Amino acid sequence: MPVLTTDAESETGIPKSLSNEPPSETMEEIEHTCPQPRLTLTAPAPFADESSCQCQAPHEKLTVAQARLGTPVDRPVRVYADGIFDLFHSGHARALMQAKTLFPNSYLLVGVCSDDLTHKFKGFTVMNEAERYEALRHCRYVDEVIRDAPWTLTPEFLEKHKIDFVAHDDIPYSSAGSDDVYKHIKEAGMFVPTQRTEGISTSDIITRIVRDYDVYARRNLQRGYTAKELNVSFINEKKYRFQNQVDKMKEKVKNVEERSKEFVNRVEEKSHDLIQKWEEKSREFIGNFLELFGPDGAWKQMFQERSSRMLQALSPKQSPVSSPTRSRSPSRSPSPTFSWLPNKTSPPSSPKAASASISSMSEGDEDEK
């Protein structure tokens, strides 16, 4: 693609090849050999002094509109972001993610200031420079890490690393005798703002540690660190260890209370189950009792049946006194008829009675015939 062949500087001090001023020199076709964005995350990002841009073609300046439209594969948009990155946290990662995704084809360079510069202009850090460098190398959005980055970006630095845009949050960063160290970058049209993540910062993390210093000191003493390593006095060491013992005792008491509550809850559950089962058994027993001994129970019916049988056995039914005369069958002989004859020894009381008895006997004989 066409590139500029001049290194003249603009009025802002930024080389014309890196400023927004339109090029005035002739352009020639030179192939770019700039490093490409990382395609794999199986290895950390390289350092700039180990794999710097060796492209011999002069770096043509891009506008924000051109960069957002996209660039050829061999000409990625080189975006620069810098910082201290102490106690690397999610706020840092989100800022780098925004810088990486500003343009479709971008190559993210991250500059990390050294301990000397940081201690001089900002203050002491928790992590040393080597640890901070390594933290950035293992961030997935970073393509290249620049060690010992300058506090204020110079034209020489921008030209050396062929930087197209600088990404940072838009809050003025006053330091090193300047109200805003990115002022000249903004004037050159090379500044692209990112959004700061609220609620998380290195200062907030350090504030938490300082606020709960006793807790963390006791924690590390319990984990085997010595009072000398923690810079703790003899008296404080004994105090922290005593507090640890008190906490252990509280924890034991708490565990006993929890177990006791758990035991009581289990007993209550069991008693509730037993009461419920007892009520069910009681209802079942009462129902069975009523079925057996109730007013219409089986026992009463059985008793009545037994009683009726006993009564029948003790007092059987009597046969009828008289029965109708059955017709005799012609094949059977008639039953003999017995006549009541007067007793020979007892004479009739009177002649009338004797005649009456004789007449009745004669009538009986006629009826049988």
From Swiss-Prot:
The modification Phosphoserine is found at residues 315, 319, 322-323, 329, 331, 335, 346, 349-350, 355, 360, 362. It holds the Pfam family CTP_transf_like. Residues 319-339, 351-362 have a biased composition (Low complexity). Its EC number is 2.7.7.15. It catalyses: phosphocholine + CTP + H(+) = CDP-choline + diphosphate. Disruption phenotype: Female mice lacking isoform 1 have reduced fecundity due to failure in ovary maturation. Male mice lacking isoform 1 have reduced fecundity due to testicular degeneration. The keyword Zinc-finger does not apply. CTP binds at residues 84-85, 92, 122, 168-169, 173, 195-197, 200. Residues 1-27, 309-369 are annotated as: Disordered. GO terms for biological process: CDP-choline pathway; ovarian follicle development; phosphatidylcholine biosynthetic process; spermatogenesis. Transmembrane segments: none annotated. It is found in: Endoplasmic reticulum; Cytoplasm. GO terms for molecular function: choline-phosphate cytidylyltransferase activity. It is an enzyme of class 2 (transferase). Phosphocholine binds at residues 122, 151. Homodimer. Belongs to the cytidylyltransferase family. This is Choline-phosphate cytidylyltransferase B. It comes from Mus musculus. The lineage of its organism: Eukaryota, Metazoa, Chordata, Craniata, Vertebrata.
